[in-house]
C-alpha cells in the first residue's frame, strides 16, 4: 500500500504486519530474487520495529497452466511440492517470518472421502517445511467439508489454527442486503469452526 511501512504500522498501533506473497519456486530466477528480497526487507523491518511478521504464501499458476484465472480461487491440480518448497524457502532465518498463513498442500478434491497416504504425507512435509515456526491454514474458498478435513490434517501436523474467510462467511453474506439474515448466518453456520 502506497505510503505505508512497517514503521508506520507500528506507530499506528498495529499488532503485526501481514504480507501476502505470491510465489512459485519454479519461476524465473529474476522473479524469485525480487520476491525473496521483498519479503526479506519486510522481515528485517519487522525485526527492527519489534512487530510480528505474518507471511501468507500462495503458489500462483503460470499463464498457460490449466485452470488459470485472474481471480483468486483455489488452484486446481496444484503441485504439493510447489507449496512445500515455497514454505521451505521462506522458513529460512534471513526472512524473519514469525508465523505463516498457508494454503493446503493439496487440491481440495484430495480432501474428500478417504484420505490418501500422499495427502497425509503432503501435510507432514508442509509442517516440516515451516522449520518449527507457527503456522495457520487458510481456506482458499474450498467447500466446508473439505476445509474441515484440511483443518483436521493441519492440526494433526502442528498447525496453530486458521485464518479463513470465504469458506466460513460467504454463505451468510449471500443474504446481503438483508443484514438480519447475514447476522443470523454468521452466528449459526459460521460459528461451527
Q: What name fits each language-model region?
A:
Residues 1-17, 23-40, 44, 48-52, ...:
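Alpha/beta enzyme core
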Residues 56-58:
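Short, well-ordered beta-to-alpha junction loops that form the rim of enzyme active sites
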Amino acid at each position: 500500500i502506497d505510503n505505508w511501512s512497517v514503521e508506520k504500522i507500528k506507530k499506528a498501533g498495529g499488532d503485526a504486519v501481514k504480507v501476502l506473497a505470491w510465489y512459485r519456486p519454479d519461476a524465473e530466477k529474476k522473479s524469485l530474487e525480487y520476491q525473496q528480497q521483498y519479503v526479506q526487507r519486510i522481515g528485517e523491518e519487522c525485526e527492527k520495529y519489534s512487530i510480528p511478521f505474518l507471511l501468507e504464501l500462495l503458489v500462483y499458476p503460470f499463464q498457460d497452466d490449466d485452470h488459470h484465472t485472474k481471480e483468486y480461487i483455489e488452484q486446481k491440480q496444484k503441485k504439493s511440492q510447489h507449496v512445500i518448497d515455497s514454505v521451505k524457502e521462506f522458513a529460512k532465518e534471513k526472512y524473519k517470518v514469525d508465523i505463516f498463513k498457508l494454503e493446503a498442500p493439496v487440491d481440495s478434491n484430495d480432501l474428500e472421502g478417504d484420505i490418501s497416504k500422499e495427502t497425509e504425507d503432503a501435510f507432514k512435509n508442509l509442517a516440516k517445511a515451516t522449520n518449527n515456526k507457527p503456522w495457520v491454514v487458510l481456506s482458499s474458498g474450498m467447500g466446508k467439508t473439505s476445509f474441515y478435513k484440511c483443518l483436521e490434517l493441519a492440526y494433526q501436523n502442528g498447525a496453530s489454527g486458521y485464518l479463513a474467510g470465504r469458506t466460513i462467511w460467504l454463505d451468510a453474506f449471500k443474504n446481503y442486503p438483508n443484514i438480519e439474515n447475514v447476522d443470523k448466518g454468521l452466528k449459526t453456520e459460521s460459528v461451527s469452526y
